């Protein structure tokens, strides 16, 4: 079986050395990698290093091996092109179709998925020109990973740091798994909630649930691989941030509501995969509640939390916005799911059965996706990414 052919483009930034780790992950997982560094990138990591790590010759100029027409063939033969790091200059050239070196020629001739992992100073990332270039690339179907927040060159700190190579690799893996299928969420903004809210009783204790957040994270990753700009509102998950996704951490149901409503203002779709507490304690004890040997504990009075899914469904931020809910049921899955779908008013409801040794914390899931139009889409037991793909297929159908 032929190995998947990956072109690793490296542009000139201090983060170029991290591309060596990405290259190692790609080659060790069975990919045939051709490295195409820019002239600036070679100031940071030399051609000999790229050749030794990839096991392939390194092409640096359009004039290398002219008889093989490398400025055309490299992109034509690739199954994936990933540019890491992608500087502001490289993003600008790619957005405007410039072809002044081998990497930009390769980007123009590639007919495969393209992933950009930007790295630059915060001011450059936030500049309107860069934002427009990124938006252009995403509209065309490229996956542009959101840069990380952290230490930058010199003493600066902010957004613009190259994402961890392991995260970039995971994005590449998901994009390759989809193959050359159309990036049908390109140019779309989607919001996903994940995890489980916690309602504090005192500084130590809280009311919570067993949601791991893994299904919501799978939804976020697959949406990014399909070209979407993704906002992930994550409640108490403990999971690493998915590459290419803007993560908003929250704790309580009230905080989750605020974050989702803010992110949904310009969203095409909202998927509420988080397990949100129905109730919260009426009062919060400023100090730890002590056990009293001679008295029964005081009762905990609960008040109702806002119904975020029903609110999102009834008051959509923009026309045509698709709203998806999740329901965890212990019995009468279909009947309870249908009743909840009518009650909440969402477009789709993903219903799964939960209980001991079922769903929570596992890497797999099975569900029934109910539509407001009466449709029923069963998803057999399998990876959570498979359920995520089905959900996005149904969302795309409704968006179109």
Predicted regions mapped to residue ranges:
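A cross-family phosphate/adenosyl-ligand binding-site feature
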Residues: 1-400
């Amino acid at each position: 079986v032929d190995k998947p052919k990956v072109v690793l483009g490296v542009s000139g930034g201090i983060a170029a050395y991290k591309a060596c780790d990405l290259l190692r992950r790609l080659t060790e997982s069975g990919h045939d990698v051709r490295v195409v560094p820019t002239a600036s990138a070679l100031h940071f990591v030399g051609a000999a290093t790229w050749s030794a790590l990839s096991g392939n010759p390194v092409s640096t100029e359009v004039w290398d091996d002219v008889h093989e027409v490398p400025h055309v063939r490299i992109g034509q033969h690739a199954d994936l092109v990933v540019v890491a790091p992608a500087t502001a200059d490289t993003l600008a050239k790619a957005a405007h179709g410039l072809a002044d070196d081998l990497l930009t020629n390769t980007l123009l001739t590639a007919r495969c998925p393209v992933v950009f992992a930007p790295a630059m100073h915060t001011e450059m990332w936030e500049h309107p020109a860069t934002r427009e270039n990124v938006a252009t690339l995403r509209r065309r179907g490229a996956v542009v990973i959101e840069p990380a927040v952290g230490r930058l060159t010199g003493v600066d700190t902010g957004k613009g740091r190259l994402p961890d190579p392991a995260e970039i690799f995971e994005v590449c893996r998901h994009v390759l798994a989809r193959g050359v299928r159309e990036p049908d969420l390109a140019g779309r903004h989607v919001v996903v909630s994940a995890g489980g809210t916690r309602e504090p009783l005192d500084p130590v204790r809280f009311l919570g649930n067993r949601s791991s957040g893994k299904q919501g994270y799978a939804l976020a990753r697959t949406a990014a691989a399909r070209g979407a700009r993704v906002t992930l509102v994550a409640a108490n998950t403990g999971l690493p941030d998915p590459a290419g996704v803007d993560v908003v951490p929250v704790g309580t149901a009230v905080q989750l509501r605020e974050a989702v409503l803010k992110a949904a203002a310009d969203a095409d779709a909202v998927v509420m995969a988080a397990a949100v507490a129905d109730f919260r304690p009426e009062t919060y004890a400023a100090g730890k509640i002590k056990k009293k040997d001679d008295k029964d504990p005081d009762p905990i009075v609960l008040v109702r939390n806002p119904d975020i899914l029903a609110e999102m469904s009834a008051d959509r931020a923009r026309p045509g916005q698709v709203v998806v809910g999740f329901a965890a049921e212990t019995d009468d899955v279909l009947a309870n799911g249908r009743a909840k779908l009518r009650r909440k008013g969402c477009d789709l409801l993903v219903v799964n059965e939960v209980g001991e040794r079922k769903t929570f914390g596992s890497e797999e899931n099975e569900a029934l996706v109910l539509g407001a139009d009466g449709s029923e889409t069963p998803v057999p037991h399998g990876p959570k990414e498979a359920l995520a793909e089905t959900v996005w297929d149904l969302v795309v159908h409704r968006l179109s």
